């Protein structure tokens, strides 16, 4: 599980939310099993519970996540910078968007730890199905992130006529590892 702290986030995110907690499951069956067990458990708790300090309200979203670029190895950092873009597909297929994301390490450099494509399945504001994707790149270190941003600004690319996507201004996050399990 990752707690995402917004550092410089586009849109109205910071007006509405303080942070995001992201849970990753290998399948919907695994998610249903674990979330059902979590909701069914009984008993007390000592100290604060999440609901004592945070309210999710109607904002829960369930996304499909495709790991376009697996981990570059080594231990997962406790805090890692990440960048995210939300893009309109404008006719580009979801499978092509996922395939394109596999090249992100070539574009951003070797310090990209992981890259994935996010597509909303349930919740959040209404929108046409498979019309948008999010791209997220997580870096091994702050220095690696800085090198990637320098690479982007030093190598501005012209629009690709074969890629109809349009993307919003990116967002910068600090990803805090709060739990990891290899299941």
Q: Which positions does each model-derived feature cover?
A:
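Acidic/polar, glycine-enriched structural segments that form the non-catalytic walls/loops
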Residues: 48
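Short S/T/G/P-rich N-terminal loop/turn motif that feeds into the first structured element of a domain
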Residues: 1-41, 52-183
């Amino acid at each position: 599980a990752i707690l995402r702290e917004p550092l410089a986030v586009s849109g109205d995110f910071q007006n509405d939310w303080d942070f995001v907690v992201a849970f990753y499951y290998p399948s919907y069956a695994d998610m249903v099993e674990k979330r059902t067990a979590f909701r069914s458990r009984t008993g007390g708790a000592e100290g604060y519970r999440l609901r004592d300090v945070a309210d999710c309200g109607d904002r829960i979203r369930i996304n499909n996540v495709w790991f376009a670029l697996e981990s570059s190895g080594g231990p997962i950092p406790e805090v890692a910078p990440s960048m995210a873009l939300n893009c309109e597909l404008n006719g580009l297929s979801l499978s092509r968007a996922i395939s394109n994301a596999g090249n992100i390490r070539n574009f951003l450099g070797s310090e990209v730890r992981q890259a994935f494509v996010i597509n909303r399945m349930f919740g959040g504001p209404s929108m046409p199905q498979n019309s948008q994707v999010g791209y997220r790149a997580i870096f091994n270190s702050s220095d690696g992130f800085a090198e990637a941003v320098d690479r982007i600004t030093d190598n501005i690319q012209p629009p690709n006529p074969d890629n109809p996507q349009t993307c919003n201004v990116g967002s910068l996050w600090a990803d805090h590892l709060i739990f990891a399990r290899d299941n």
